[in-house]
Each structure stands twice: as structure tokens, then as C-alpha cells.
């Protein structure tokens, strides 16, 4: 059993210390999320998305909301889009910084974990200011967010960006100049460009194999085309490259966060003049039309048209996709989720062959997976 973020069971056949075959056993955290999503309203499913990749709940919320909004033909106002990008990049940094810290522990470097976890706690403090919760926030709604960002928080995030950049430099100094750490990663778990594509690997694991594919650049959403950032790639596709790509991605996330705050537009954060979003609470208490609108939206849900859509987002673990099939009304006819962790782990039977048992933690940790999202 490999217990990092959820439970993954590997059945290994060994010849001494060499792995002859590997059979990964998944499903220990299967909860039937897709079927649940077909039996409740679109907005009611948002809290369930928190439990997919629970290390980046806001990323799941927003990806699902974008899929439903694509079905509805809605586009958020500029401030609402910028606010979502801010939440996405904070989530990306939080997920990667924990993955880097835990990976250090996997291969015997305890100190780095403490440094990384301190930065992650700062982001959770921002989550609390923004959403009211530190972990499973359920912040996003179809057509917007539950609340606007406090101005004081934006100033604090800018300070955090400077501090986090220093932590990344310290992390690199501790690990990437450590010969023992480098020897455990370089040349281990090599995935070629061809294999990465054929197995459907996405995210940092794909880019570490030298393929420059990032959905924020390839098919921009939420205004990502308005921000300047680079897509880091590796050369050899080994554990070392997967680690260094995530380090550089965090630097690019800090770069995007600074741009979002510096260019944050004014205006509403939610869709306006639509019956599918909840009105402001103060209007519900004083305006009859708003009260009726809240009642209808809460009891009957968003009235989606018939049709099929697929929306994919560049999440910390890779391409998180939602397929929605609607026959009209407030419930989806079919909900299908593309789990990046499940797709990334599919290569394990082929990848593990020929490696030593001592390489297993290094290889698994380099994938930075979450079983809650893998098993759904």
C-alpha cells in the first residue's frame, strides 16, 4: 500500500529487488461522484467537486462551473474572470508546494516539507478570507462566486508572492544541489514523449517529457490570454524533470498572480440580468422579484438547454475535464469526468518494469497524484 494522498495498492512481482510486473489497484476511494452529479442540481454538485482533488478544491469548483456555463452560453464579467484566475493560481501553487514538500519526505528530505507547508498555510489563510473556509470551500457558483475579494487580501497576497519566491529559491538550494537527492531522481522513471502522449498523460508530468502543452495557452479560458507566463518543459521525462517543472510552474503562478492583482478590473463578479444566478441577500430581503428568483433557482435549479459540452481546465494534476449531456432542465442527463490522476497512473504497469523496489517511492511521488480525484 502506498498511502500519500489516498490509498493506492501496488501488486508487484519481484526478482530479488527488481520489479518484473506491476498491477496498480485503484478504487478504494470510489464514491460514485458521477452518478451523484446526475441526480442533483448543477449548483448542488459544487460541494462534491471539492472532494475530487481536495488539495486544490477551488480548481475543481471552477472547472465544473465553467463546464456548466459553457452549456448555458454564459460568460462571466471581467472582474469575475480575474477573481477565478486568482483562485486558480493560488490553488495551483498550494497543490504544487505541498507536492514538492511531501516528495522531499518520500526520498528522505524532511526539512523541505516544513518550509513548504508554511507557505501552504499562508494560502489557506487567504482561502479563509476569500471563501470563509480553509479547505473544502465550495466557493464557486454557476455564473459567479459567493463573494468578492477583500482589498486588504490583495495587498497581503502581493507580499506573499515575494516571500514564496524566496522559499522556492531555498527549496532549490536544499534539494537540487544535493547529490543524494539528484541521484535518486535522475534517470529514474523515464517517460518518453511518445509514451506520454500514447498513455494520455497531461499536466506537469507531460511537460516534463518535453511536450509544451498547457491548456491555459492552447485553449485559453477565463482571460488567461491576457496574462504573460511561460510554460516550463523538461528534457528527459524522468523524476528529476517532473520535480523541476513543478518548481518552475510555481514561479509562473506567482507571476500570474501579480498580474491579476495589478490589473484587477472593477465591476460585478457574477452574471447580471439572468434568472439562473442567485440575487444578493439584501435584495432578497427587500425586493419581491429577487425573492421569487431565489426561490425558483434554489428549488428548480439552473434551467440548462439541451445539448452536450466538454470543458477541460489545466489543473495542478493535469487536464481535468467535465462532459455534460443535457436534455434540458435543472439536472444533467449524463456527467462524465476526466481524471488527470487516473490517466497519469495508467502508465505504471509499463513504467515500473525493470526498476528497483527502492525506486517506487521516487516514481510515485513524482506523479503527484490524488486518489480522491482518481477514484471519484
Summary of predicted features, one role per range:
Residues 3-376:
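Metal/cofactor-centered catalytic core regions of large enzymes
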Amino acid at each position: 500500500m502506498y498511502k500519500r494522498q489516498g490509498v493506492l495498492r501496488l501488486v508487484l512481482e519481484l526478482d530479488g529487488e527488481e520489479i518484473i510486473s506491476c498491477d496498480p489497484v485503484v478504487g478504494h476511494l470510489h464514491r460514485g461522484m458521477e452518478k451523484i452529479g446526475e441526480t442533483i442540481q448543477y449548483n448542488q454538485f459544487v460541494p462534491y467537486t471539492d472532494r475530487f482533488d481536495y488539495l486544490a478544491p477551488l480548481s475543481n469548483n471552477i472547472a465544473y462551473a465553467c463546464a456548466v456555463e459553457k452549456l448555458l452560453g454564459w460568460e462571466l464579467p471581467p472582474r469575475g474572470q480575474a477573481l477565478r484566475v486568482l483562485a486558480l493560481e493560488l490553488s495551483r501553487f498550494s497543490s504544487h508546494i505541498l507536492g514538492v514538500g511531501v516528495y522531499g519526505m518520500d526520498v528522505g528530505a524532511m526539512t523541505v516539507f516544513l518550509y513548504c507547508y508554511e507557505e501552504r498555510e499562508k494560502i489557506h489563510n487567504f482561502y479563509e478570507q476569500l471563501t470563509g473556509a480553509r479547505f473544502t470551500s465550495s466557493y464557486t457558483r454557476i455564473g459567479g462566486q459567493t463573494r468578492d475579494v477583500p482589498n486588504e487580501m490583495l495587498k497581503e497576497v502581493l507580499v506573499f508572492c515575494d516571500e514564496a519566491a524566496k522559499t522556492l529559491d531555498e527549496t532549490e538550494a536544499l534539494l537540487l544541489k544535493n547529490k543524494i537527492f539528484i541521484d535518486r531522481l535522475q534517470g529514474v522513471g523515464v517517460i518518453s514523449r511518445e509514451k506520454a502522449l500514447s498513455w494520455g498523460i497531461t499536466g506537469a508530468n507531460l511537460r516534463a517529457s518535453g511536450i509544451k502543452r498547457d491548456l491555459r495557452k492552447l485553449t485559453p479560458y477565463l482571460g488567461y490570454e491576457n496574462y504573460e507566463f511561460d510554460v516550463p518543459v523538461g528534457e528527459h521525462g524522468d523524476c528529476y524533470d517532473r520535480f523541476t517543472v513543478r518548481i518552475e510552474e510555481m514561479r509562473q503562478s506567482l507571476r500570474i498572480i501579480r498580474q491579476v492583482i495589478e490589473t484587477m478590473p472593477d465591476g460585478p463578479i457574477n452574471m447580471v440580468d439572468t434568472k439562473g444566478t442567485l440575487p444578493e441577500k439584501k435584495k432578497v430581503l427587500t425586493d419581491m422579484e429577487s425573492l421569487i428568483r431565489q426561490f425558483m433557482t434554489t428549488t428548480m435549479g439552473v434551467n440548462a438547454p439541451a445539448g452536450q459540452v466538454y470543458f477541460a481546465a489545466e489543473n495542478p494534476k493535469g487536464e481535468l475535464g467535465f462532459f455534460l449531456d443535457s436534455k434540458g432542465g435543472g439536472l444533467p442527463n449524463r456527467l462524465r469526468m476526466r481524471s488527470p490522476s487516473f490517466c497519469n497512473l495508467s502508465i505504471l504497469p509499463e513504467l515500473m518494469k525493470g526498476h528497483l523496489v527502492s525506486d517506487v517511492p521516487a516514481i510515485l511521488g513524482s506523479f503527484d497524484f490524488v486518489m480522491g480525484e482518481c477514484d471519484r
